[in-house]
Regions:
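Secretory targeting and sorting signals
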Residues: 1-30
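Metalloprotease/metallohydrolase-associated module, dominated by Zn2+-dependent proteases
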Residues: 2, 108, 113, 129-190
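Acidic/histidine-rich, surface-exposed loop or edge segments in extracytoplasmic proteins
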Residues: 32-45, 103, 142-145
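A short alpha-helix/helix-coil micro-patch that ends at or immediately precedes a cysteine
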Residues: 39-70
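Extracytoplasmic/secreted envelope proteins and their assembly/folding machinery
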Residues: 50-57, 115-119, 137, 159, ...
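Active-site recognition of the HExxH zinc-binding catalytic motif
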Residues: 60, 116-130
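Short, well-ordered secondary-structure micro-motifs within conserved domains or adaptor modules
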Residues: 67-92, 98-102
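Short pre-active-site segment immediately N-terminal to the catalytic Zn-binding motif
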Residues: 101-119
């Protein structure tokens, strides 16, 4: 009788544990899902260049996957302030993913391609420095490329660098490691 009762209890316990055994735990080799950081940009002061900044956001969104650009909403913060003036296009980067960019009419009046300018300036916010190669294929060559250049997309190396800078967690990035010095705001001119 005691044995029969013990077997019954054991069978009941095993019956309760069976569903737990059937559920497989994720394997250690499973790829962690990448975290995508969203940066919000504000075009309320972009004047006649709003469409160019939206196009720059689309260019970057179609080129990289670790960071996404979205227009500011009523509930979001602002990472990127966008302004327009009569000077030269430029970016003031306060930290990776944050800063202020200007569409300067001087470059537009000289004939530089507006979507290339806006995509280039956002590149600075995404951690890319100027690289004065003079090549149209290099987005970050900026105004060193010919005025006739219409390439508004980052090349493979530029895309890879942005992916690397935004890979991993959503935690704050050390701006010194991202290429900025002393926590100061850095200015890049097209």
């Amino acid at each position: 009788m005691l044995v029969r009762k013990a077997v019954g209890v054991l069978a009941g316990v095993l019956g309760l544990m069976l569903p737990l055994v059937a559920v497989a735990a994720p394997s250690a080799s499973a790829e962690p899902q990448a975290l995508v950081r969203t940066l919000y940009y504000d075009v309320s002061q972009a004047q006649e260049f709003v469409a160019d900044w939206d196009r720059a956001a689309t260019n970057w969104n179609n080129s990289v996957s670790n960071v996404k650009l979205a227009r500011r909403t009523s509930t979001s913060g602002v990472n990127i302030r966008i302004l327009a003036d009569n000077g030269w296009p430029r970016a003031y980067v306060s930290s990776l993913g944050n800063g202020t960019v200007y569409m300067g009419r001087q470059a537009v009046q000289q004939g530089y391609h507006r979507p290339r300018i806006s995509t280039h300036e956002i590149g600075h916010i995404l951690g890319l420095p100027d690289r004065r190669t003079g090549l149209c294929a290099d987005l970050m060559s900026g105004s060193s490329a010919p005025v006739s250049c219409r390439n508004e997309l980052p090349n493979a190396a530029e895309r890879a660098e942005v992916e690397r800078r935004f890979a991993g967690s959503l935690a704050a990035v050390d701006v010194r490691a991202a290429g900025y010095t002393g926590g100061r705001t850095e200015c890049f001119v097209y």
